[in-house]
Amino acid sequence: MVKSELVQIIARHNPHLFQRDVENIVNAIFEEISTALANGDRVELRGFGAFSVKSRSARNGRNPRTGEAVAVDEKWIPFFKTGKDLRDRLNQ
């Protein structure tokens, strides 16, 4: 599912909302989650899961085309941990 499909489904289930309004709401939610993660905060959606950022240490990598060793800098990556309710639903 892509974002536009999500917007269409939510709009279909909520006929009192215009699709443009639903799209604005979905975009606002994603923007707030992104901003919180960029600030190093954790975003928890009870029962669904939690978004956070984790540090990936600097390491030596290898260029797959040439085989040359390449230094890869430390970086922050987004991480999602599923909530218990979501895990239970997936494993029914």
Curated annotation (Swiss-Prot):
What GO molecular function annotations does the UniProt record carry, in alphabetical order? DNA binding; structural constituent of chromatin
Q: Which PROSITE patterns match?
A: HISTONE_LIKE
The answer to keyword Iron applying to this record is no
- Keywords of this entry: DNA recombination, DNA-binding, Transcription, Transcription regulation, Translation regulation
Which terms under GO biological process does the entry name? DNA recombination; regulation of DNA-templated transcription; regulation of translation
Pfam families of this UniProt entry? Bac_DNA_binding
- Determine if Transcription regulation is one of this entry's keywords: yes
The Gene Ontology CC terms held by the record are:
chromosome; cytosol
Q: How does it assemble?
A: Heterodimer of an alpha and a beta chain.
- What is the protein's known function? This protein is one of the two subunits of integration host factor, a specific DNA-binding protein that functions in genetic recombination as well as in transcriptional and translational control.
Q: Which family does the record claim for this protein? A: Belongs to the bacterial histone-like protein family.
For this entry, the protein name equals Integration host factor subunit beta
